[in-house]
Amino acid sequence: MRAVVQRVSFSEVRVEGKLRGRIKQGLMVLLGIKKGDSKAEGDYLLEKIVNLRIFPDEEGKMNRSLLDIEGEILLVSQFTLYGDARKGRRPSFSAAELPELAEALFDYCVDGLRQRGVQVETGTFGAEMLLSIENDGPCTILLDSEKLF
């Protein structure tokens, strides 16, 4: 499982021109699920995400977590995080989980964040979406449950 975590002061997602989710201060998280991922990978990433100390403290140092600032998360599924462009010009997405299995794991992650006390907004799984992101910093962190980076 992979996540692109962006510290934002504002983010929203629209589906077919209609607002689907909007947050203020918090994290915009793009989540990719690969074949074979399980709840264990989800739990690992969720703990990382909510506890990442990437928000500034009183001295301006990145020392506070999403939980510390009581921030929100906009969580959007993105299978293209498992795109492999090493050969040719068209990426292969064969490492991405099948949609029906990925959706169940995505829903598990949404519930897991809410159980951790986080306000969560989402896009629509499998839909074409338009994201607006006001990246604060900018601050973008890449996470991988296999600890590849």
From Swiss-Prot:
Molecular-function GO term, any one: Ser(Gly)-tRNA(Ala) hydrolase activity
First-listed, main subcellular location of the protein, grouped into a coarse class: cytoplasm
Pfam families associated with the record: Tyr_Deacylase (PF02580)
Keyword Translocase: no
InterPro entries: Daa-tRNA_deacyls_DTD (IPR003732), DTD-like_sf (IPR023509)
GO CC, one annotated term: cytoplasm
Motif (Gly-cisPro motif, important for rejection of L-amino acids): 137-138
Cellular compartments annotated: Cytoplasm
GO biological process: D-amino acid catabolic process
Main enzyme class: hydrolase
Secretion signal span: none
SS bond partners: none
Enzyme Commission numbers on file: 3.1.1.96
Function field: An aminoacyl-tRNA editing enzyme that deacylates mischarged D-aminoacyl-tRNAs. Also deacylates mischarged glycyl-tRNA(Ala), protecting cells against glycine mischarging by AlaRS. Acts via tRNA-based rather than protein-based catalysis; rejects L-amino acids rather than detecting D-amino acids in the active site. By recycling D-aminoacyl-tRNA to D-amino acids and free tRNA molecules, this enzyme counteracts the toxicity associated with the formation of D-aminoacyl-tRNA entities in vivo and helps enforce protein L-homochirality.
Free-text note regarding domains: A Gly-cisPro motif from one monomer fits into the active site of the other monomer to allow specific chiral rejection of L-amino acids.
Family under the similarity heading: Belongs to the DTD family.
Assembly notes: Homodimer.
Protein name: D-aminoacyl-tRNA deacylase
Gene symbol of the encoding locus: dtd
